Amino acid sequence: QEQHSQLEAAKTQVEKDMGEKISNLERELENANDLLCSTKRKGVMLSEEELTAMSPTAAAVAKVVKPGMKLTELYNAYVETQDKLLMEKQENKRITKYLDEIVKEVEAKSPILKRQREEYERMQKTVASLSAKLEQAMREIQRMQDETDKANKCSSVLERENQRLELQIKDLSQQIRVLLMELEEARGNFVQRDDVSSANISSSSEVITQHLVTYRNIEELQQQNQRLLVALRELGEAKEREEQESTSSRVSELEKELENALSELQQLREARSHQMTLVESIVRQRDMYRILLSQTTGVVLPAQDETALTSTPRKSPGVSLDGSTSTPAAVVVSDSTEAAEARAALKQLQEVFENYRKEKAENDRMLNEQHDKLQEQVTELRSQNTKISTQLEFASKRYEMLQDNVEGYRREITALQEKTQKLSATTQKQEQIINTLTHDLRAANEKLAVAEVRAENLKREKELLKMSEVRLTQERESLVAEQRGQNLLLTNLQTIQVTLERSETEIKQRYNNQIEKLEQELAQTKKKLEHEIEQRHLLGKNQDVQVLELKKQYEMELNLHNNTKELLKNSHKEISVLKQQLNSFELQLASRSSQQAANRDKDVNIEDVEEIKTKLRQSEELVNDLKERLKTATSNVEQYRSVVLNLEESLNKEKQVTEEVRKTIEVRLKESSEYQSQLEKKMMESEKEKQELRDEKHKTVEQMEQQVTQLRQSLSSLQAEVQQALQRATTSASNEQKAKQDCQEQARIAAEAQNKYERELMLHAADVEALQAAKKQLTSASAIRHKCEETAQKAGSQLLESRASWEERERMLKEEVSQIQSRCKDLEKQNGLLHEQIESLSKKMVTSVQEGALNMSFGEEGKSQEQVMEILRFVRREKEIAEARFEVAQVECLRYRQRIEHMERELHELQDSLNAEREKVQVTAKTMAQHEELMKKTETMNVLIESNKILREENEKQEQELQQLQAKIRKLESNILPLQESNAELSEKSGMLQAEKKLLEEDVRRWRARTQHLLSQQKDTDAEEYKKLLSEREVNTKRIQQLTEETGKLKTEVARTNASLNTCQSQLQSVKDDLTKIKAEKEKLQKELDAKILDIQEKIKTITQVKKIGRRYKTQYEELKVTHDKMVAEASSAKADQLQEQASQKEVQELKDSLQRSEAKVTTMQTTVDNMQKTLDDKDNEIKEHQEQISRMQAELSHLHKDLQDKTAQEEQMRQQINEKEEKTKKTLLVVRQKLAQNNGAKEQLTRENEDLKQKNANLEQQKEELEVRMSALRSQYDGRISRLERELREQQERHHEQRDEPQETTRIPQQRQITLQPTTAAGERGSANTSEPPTANIKPTPSKVTTAAVPVNKSTPRASIRPMVTPAAVSTPTSTPTATVMPTTQVDQQEVQSEGQMEHVPVFGSASGSVRSTSPNVQSSLPQPILTLQQQTQTTAFVQPTQQSHATIESPTQETPVEIVQSSPVERPTTSSTFGTYSATPSSSIPKRPREEEEDSTIETPEQIADDTDQQRTKKRKEEDIEEKTETEAVINTEDALHILTQCSNMEFPLEEEIVESPIQTSQVIESQAPEQLQNVQSTQDSLQDTPPKKTHNLVIVISDEENEDEQEGYEEEEQEDEEEDEDDAGIGEGDDSNEETGSADGNEDYEGDDAEEADGTDPDTETEDSMTAGEGNQRAADSQNIGDSGVVTAESTFSQETREQPSSASDRQGPRPPQSPRRQAHPPRLTILAPPQELGPPPAQRIPVARRQSVGRGLQLTPGVGGMQHFFDEEDRTVPSTPTLVVPHRTDGFAEAIHSPQVAGVPRFRFGPPEDMPQASSSHSDLGQLASQGGLGMYDTPLFLAHEEESGGRSVPTTPLQVAAPVSVFAENPAADTSDHASQSVPMVTTSTGNVPTSVDSGAADEGDEVFVEAESEGIGAESTLEMDTQQEEPVQPSEADLPSTSQDPPSSSIADTSSSKPKPRRVWLQPQPGGRPFKRSRGGSDFRGRGGINRSNI
């Protein structure tokens, strides 16, 4: 049957698979039909959607390529796109070229951008780091605030709850009291009432508690309720009123605040508009200056960025030509024309003066703007202050919130305490419940014991029953299994019949369907054939059409090809024409180049050439483009050809294909007809096969029916067997019932026996008899048992034997079954194979059907049918063999079944006999067990009674211990209360501290407000005071920080106390947990008791054995009882001792403090709990060993003692900790008080400082008035100058005539001397002396390391070529700005000077002077100098050794400082005398020597001070001066232009704010030793000098230099190098407009450190260095272009304006880098003579020059900015200025662009600053100007005027207070430690004073004159500030090294210190202390670094 079912399942599966395959085939057919339909619609176009569905790429192409487009059209489009692409590429090339050019420009500026980017990135990093820190801090603060808020909330809530509950408790207690009293009175007892007097009532709460809480009856209660309701309503109304009032007041406040804010906003807007108007005015001013410049010079300045790059206006070639042509004409002009020119000059001067006035007004405006800026900063600071204050308030509020939270926590604690009390009450109740439960448990245990005995009996019965049940179930299951097998056989047979019938019907249907499908397919193939024939015809037509189209296209392409050929020819022609043009152009170029060689001056040809070149380039590009196009055209033509050829080929191919298709279709038609006939034959054969299959099926059905009958017979036999098994089951059930009855009888007998036994127990006599009888019964029972065992063993052996034989049979049977199963499996496999073969056949049939439709021969089909027939035959044979085997297997199966039945019968018989034997044995065993159980029960009853007593006693003890523990817990709670109180006290203290903190904060706010108010009152405070205020402010902030830290500490302490409270609570919780544990342990003990009871039951067995011994047992039992009682007594005594010890522990614990008590008690609780556990364990073991328990108890006692000692020690530690905490709190309080006192002191100090500031303000106002007086004096000077200028005009004209007589000399000199000024962008090489445009000088100071030695070394003085410079006036307060006038010399002098041509022409200089020392000498304090008249003035000479000048320049934000040292009036009080110290740069010594020579002013009549050396030198110098005058005047003037400009120059006011060029300084001795050639020259000219006494004495500066041609070339080289470097330096400038031409105010005391200082180094004496000049641009230009006109004598009148004092430097931080050193030839230092000017005016009455806080750094002395007249009148020859050079500067955008121009002299041969080439270079030396401070009285130049340097170095000079002295004084420097050094590279003087040891003595005489000098030699100023911050300090602090002193050279000189011959730039920090008005700045590369006192960042000002 199973096989049958499996076969059927396989069959169904196969059918399913076949069905699925058929359905798949049908689907494929449908798809094929659809495709055929679509192919029919080929003529119709597909829609876009269909196309996209088919292939998206095709759809995309279809969108682009329209259906009408032909291939040629497509290709045409492609060609067009290619052309476009070419054009685009060419455009791209052009663009890339432009881009490359732009990139080059950008790369040129890349260093600037790099530097700026680096700075910006650095700043960004710092900002980012700071912001990150800030955010972190803010997050921390926020977190802390959140935590405090939460804590405050909780604490406030709990506190309120606590208060409410306390009030409730009070009220309730009062109510209860009153009610109790009423009760007592009602009962009749007398109760004394407390009289409550109304006088004692202090608060509303007391009134409420007394009157509204209590009531005696219900009526009173109702009355009270009514009162309470009334009070509630009233309170609610009042609350609402209050809320309304508060909201209204808040709203009004907010409205006011809004109005204030709006008004402030309006003010800010107005200020902004004001600033905008200012900016517009500044822009207009800049434009005006630009126009003026273009008018005067003819130079059109480019836009801001371009002007920043060019230092001087380019010399227009037109102007130079005019000048050269006009010079001969000027000879013929009459006197009238001269007069007209003079008038014109006068007019120009007047215009200049008016311009000056305007500039002055603008200056004032600038100051006001700056003042406004400062005020804005003040407002910002205020806003910051308010922000901080609000933050503080916020913090205080947060703190209050925290306090509220703490209170809430306290309430929580109280609530928790109440909870603990409740829990303790619940524990007591639970203990009572536990007691009751234990009693119940005992009862239950007794019942349990009885129940267990019964349960055991029942279990045994149950087991027996189970055994029988299992047997029966097994039998039943075997019967059921047989029945199931028979049923399955029947059902399988039926299903086989059904499935066979179903399969027959399905096969019929399938065949019918297949036939129908085949017929359909035939029809379809016919249709397809017809359709294909139609398509073939269509294709033929289409192909004909295409051929025609292709022919047309071919013709089109041929035409196109011809066109392209024509185009090509044309292009070739064009190319040939272009080549011809090119050749012609080249010829023209060649001719023009030859013409150019002939006429270099003609610039037009060059332009033509350039144009031609550009055209050439364009034409070349065109040619290239055309070539590319030609290439593309040719390639296109070739492609067209290839396309045409391809089309022809494709046509031919298509024709061939159509023919092939026709042939194939005909062949297929034939094949299909043949295939149809084959299919019909196959159909017939398949029908025959079908009939055969039916016959086979019938046979198989008959066979199956036979099998079914056989199976039914076997089923009937099985049923008979099942009935027999059921009969056996009934018999066994009856047997079971009988056995149960027997059991019941036995139980009844046992119960009776038990009762009898109990009675016998009561009677002791009957016990022994019962025992004997039991023994007898036992012996008999044991004998019976032995017999039973023997029989059982026999039966077991028989059973084993039978089981072994049965197992063998079973194994045999299993083997047979497995063989049968393997056969079945084989059959199944064969059957499966058959099915697979059938499936494969069917598949083959289907495939053959399908293939037959395509290509199938009848021969193959026949073969396949034969194969199928063979397979069917084979299958039939196999089936017959399988049936035969199956029959044999069935027979064997029956035989084995009969054997199995026989064996089972035998087995049943054996089992029955065995069971009978077992029952007998069990009965005997039960009787014995029952008897033994009865004996045991009697014994256990006695034992249980005794154990119950013991357990009850133990329970009572445990209850007592529990009560003790509860009492301890209560005590712990009481201990926690004082802790809470102490916590509250601490919180109160913290509140107090907070209040104090608030007060302090309020004080701080008040003082801040006051300081702000004072600051706003004072417009410009003293720098010192400002620093003090800042430092005090820092101190205050530190104090505030300390206070906040302390408050933080207090908070942490509060937190600690909270933590301790929490720990206490946690300990309490742990105690509760311990209680629960104890309970759990109690339960465990009870469980253990139960276990012990079981143990006792086991012990009873041993007692039974003892009973056998009889009476001996009783006596032993009694003895044991006695001993037991004793042991119990001992245990109780031990427990009593334990209790006593616990009591002593309690007493000890009561002594402990608040915190320690709780901890100690918790620990003791734990120990006691442990003890409890131990004692419980001991009690369990007491039954066994009492003695062990006693020893353990003793051990526990010792442990407890130890614990006690430990806890006492812990107590002491806790006390110490508490004491320490109290001391800490006291200390913090003391600290807070001290800080309060300190704050009060700070307040007083601030008030004092405010008063001082007010006084200083008053002084400043006085000084302003004095400056106004000076302005009036200056005006009178201008009138004098105008008259002088007229004279000079005449003299110049005369000189022109003389010059014509000496044309040779004039031509020679310009060639030698001329140093052309080039724009800063030019970077030509050395030797370009003949270039048309003159180079400019960028003079800036560079610090140099100074080492002094006795041996003087000759050093070449590098030349300073100074370019003209527009110096805007310093932004100052509206006081009179000083002016510098040019004093003309007499005609005689000029003529005499002209006689000598050898001398170099040197102008009197500001920043551009040759070698004049522009600083005042060290003035001795002991000599008050009177002011003398003009007649008393004598000429003084100044010998200047080339030195490296170290000075720190403070430039005003917009001006660089070309300084004119023109001394004409005593108003300025310039002292031309200067001290010169010679220091050779030998590494051996570093001590600066005292200068040996001082110049004496003619006004001073102190001959005893002047040494012989100086007199001799003066005489020599005078001679030299006259000689120079002659030589220079002869060599100067070429043109009328020069005359015109000379007039301007001579009348020029030389701005004191121009750049200062350091002059080489050397003593007379050194000069004598080093430059003998020069002295000889001087002696040769002495006579002429003496013959010409000066009518007016002037400050004349003459440089005697032997260097001529060499100098020229070097100048060019220098300038060109510097130009390159200047471009780089411009990057350093902070603002884009601050360029080379910008000038800073010379009054700056700026720390000149930055990039200049860093790169500067002292030059080694051996190394030859070309040091650059001062001026921060870093560009040295040979200033030879500036001539002194013919006079050669110019007086510098310099006035000191104190306006500069207040001027802060906004751009003082800026500084540009200096270019590197260039080696220089050694040359003798030039000498210069300074002629003292006439003093025209007296000094102002009270001019003070405080030199406050001078640092030990070499400080430059300042000149106040003199505003130069004639600013805008400089021509192309503005390089040849007799006085100061004018450096053309673009006007600044930041409002400080007042320009001071120097006049220009056209045609005058240019002179040159710088030493002759053959002189040795002086690397560095010191000029002891530092001693000025020590001498007390300072000259005019003692002010840090010459510390200014040009803007390009990045810095600007802040003007500080100028120093003025009553009269020029020449004094020897007394202090060797204080020194200044000049850079060796400059011929222009530059002075820095270094006050290493500055004495504070000030001359009283000088002070009386009103010209005293204040020197603050504070310990700070000298000690702390005098130290110089630099990388390499190699000298002592007293003797500042040259490294500290910035030199004027732009190129860093090589170090002159020992062992340093390298020229590495070293970073240097120079600290300057400004004058009171100024701001000190420290310059450093890339940014500002402020240190020391008063270091203020620009951003702060």
UniProtKB/Swiss-Prot annotation:
Residue numbers spanned by region Disordered: 672-706, 1290-1352, 1438-1529, 1561-1752, 1795-1832, 1870-1997
Topology within the bilayer: Peripheral membrane protein
InterPro entries per UniProt: TPR/MLP1
Tissue expression from the record: Expressed in epithelial cells, oocytes and egg (at protein level).
Keywords: Cell cycle, Cell division, Centromere, Chromosome, Coiled coil, Cytoplasm, Cytoskeleton, Kinetochore, Membrane, Mitosis, mRNA transport, Nuclear pore complex, Nucleus, Protein transport, Translocation, Transport
Ranges of compositional bias, category Basic and acidic residues: 672-702, 1290-1305, 1511-1529
Biased composition (Low complexity): 1950-1959
Coiled-coil residues: 1-36, 101-277, 335-1103, 1129-1305
MF GO annotations: chromatin binding; heat shock protein binding; mitogen-activated protein kinase binding; mRNA binding; protein homodimerization activity; structural constituent of nuclear pore
Amino acid composition bias (Polar residues), ranges on this chain: 1306-1321, 1328-1347, 1446-1487, 1561-1587, 1692-1709, 1817-1830, 1879-1899
Compartment annotation: Nucleus; Nucleus membrane; Nucleus envelope; Nucleus, Nuclear pore complex
Ranges of biased composition (kind: Acidic residues): 1601-1637, 1644-1667, 1902-1915
GO BP: cell division; cellular response to heat; mitotic spindle assembly checkpoint signaling; mRNA export from nucleus; mRNA export from nucleus in response to heat stress; negative regulation of RNA export from nucleus; negative regulation of transcription by RNA polymerase II; negative regulation of translational initiation
Major place of residence: nucleus
Record's GO cellular component terms: chromosome, centromeric region; cytoplasm; cytoplasmic dynein complex; mitotic spindle; nuclear inclusion body; nuclear membrane; nuclear periphery; nuclear pore
Similarity comment: family membership: Belongs to the TPR family.
Quaternary structure (record): Homodimer. Part of the nuclear pore complex (NPC). Interacts with nuclear receptor KPNB1; the interaction occurs in a RanGTP-dependent manner. Associates with the Importin alpha/Importin beta receptor.
Role played: Component of the nuclear pore complex (NPC), a complex required for the trafficking across the nuclear envelope. Functions as a scaffolding element in the nuclear phase of the NPC essential for normal nucleocytoplasmic transport of proteins and mRNAs, plays a role in the establishment of nuclear-peripheral chromatin compartmentalization in interphase, and in the mitotic spindle checkpoint signaling during mitosis. Involved in the quality control and retention of unspliced mRNAs in the nucleus. Implicated in nuclear export of mRNAs transcribed from heat shock gene promoters.
The protein's name in its UniProt record: Nucleoprotein TPR
Gene encoding the protein: tpr
